[in-house]
Amino acid sequence: MQTILSFLSSLSERIGRALRSMLRLPSLPAGDLLHDRNYRRIFASVIITHFGAQITMLALPLTAATVLNATPTQMGFLMAAEIVPFVLLSLPAGVWLDRVRKLPVYVVGESVFALTLATVPIAAWTGVLSMTWLYVVGFVLGCVHVFGGTAAQIVLTQIVSRERLVEAHSKNALAVSGSEIAGPGLAGALIKLLGAPIAIAFDALL
């Protein structure tokens, strides 16, 4: 287990270095928004978050199906657990975020997201993983998406000037599209190589 975690940590560090190197390419036009260090961090976060989401999107239900032999009904409940927070909390989250600082919410959300994901491979390794566990994980991840995702959008408007918001949103959309195109294939290979629960650990490290 320690060897696998060391491998995942090393791999995530290499991906991070490659991404940082890519974002420092001298070929960028002089006025490109990526020259802004604060925006670069947001942009890198978008790529990493959405690539990791492709892993979890495949690995979480596969963990339920292959490790816990989940029934179709249980798989439906797992999907519902991730969706319910959007239905119940979207409006309250918006009202609450109007009254608090957004960046700490985003940072805490990312930390909770990583810690929640990390419980899945640990629970699988120790033999205590259950469908109830996965339901809770799915619900917490959904809550993080509601609060953290909304906060991230607001943080972007605070970092980037109004005149450059269209450019920022365009770049972010491109990053999301690229992650969604390349992510599933890479996620599938990672799951096949390491197994679904350990692949989730990789997303947690990202």
Role assignments for model-derived ranges:
Residues 2-206:
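Alpha-helical transmembrane-bundle signature of multi-pass membrane transport and export proteins
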